Amino acid sequence: MCIRDRQGPFPGDPVAALPPVHGTFLDAARRDPGRCRVGYFTRPPLAHVEIHPDVALAMTATLAAIEDLGHEVVEVSPPFNDSLLPMFTALWSSLALLTPIDEEDEGRLQPLTQYLREQGRAISGNELATAVSMLRINSRAAMTATAHLDAVLVPTLAQLPALVGQLRDDDDPAADFAAQVAYSPYCAGYNISGQPAINVPMNWNSDGLPVGVQLVGRMHDEETIISLAAQLEATHDWRHRIPAMW
């Protein structure tokens, strides 16, 4: 329902979820996707990041399920790498400055937000423009590299679901930001490229926690990944599984 109501561009949007080509998004969920070629990579785009064994296991299990459904799986290299991190950080820090805050109210902000705003003030207009341009160029290269695939399967997170406040470090907001980057190294590149992606909780670890992986689609092709996700759900129904801690 959310994607249905938000389909199409708002004035000025650089990217948007276009209306489906064949019927509705609900129709896509009910439609067999046909035989797809699904690329995958497990290695994090950031070299210093390690993934939890349960995340790797979720990838292995999901790839097996995809093959069992008759699809082809192809290992690919991560289309994003460490070179994007400084550019992403420049953009993220600048975005923290979009909301004007009175100087006397700055101290009321979360330390991480204060830190990002401080970093953003140190970035010149030329540096920000360069970062945005390089991110767009890399996004085009990433989409070109995977254009022969119907979808790409990657982990959603590098670690298991975090406890509330687990990553927060008010005493060292730089460490807080670094922890968040290491926790979620896979999503940022696709958030920047604007490609559609859908999380599927295909695997559950021994503690009863869902471990998600995500299907990333071609630009403006929500339909294929919705069909694939629905097909996986039909054969590995997770709708009624609830973690014990809930």
Question: What role is predicted for each listed range?
Answer:
Residues M143, A175-V200:
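Small-aliphatic-rich amphipathic alpha-helix that forms the alpha element of a beta-alpha
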Residues A16-A17, P86, W92, P161-S184:
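Short, surface-exposed loop/helix-turn segments at secondary-structure junctions
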Residues L46-M59, L63, N126-V132:
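Active-site pocket-shaping loop/turn-to-helix segments
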Residues D27-T42, L91-A145, P155-Q159, N199-L209:
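Short helix-loop capping/hinge segments that flank enzyme active sites or metal/cofactor-binding pockets
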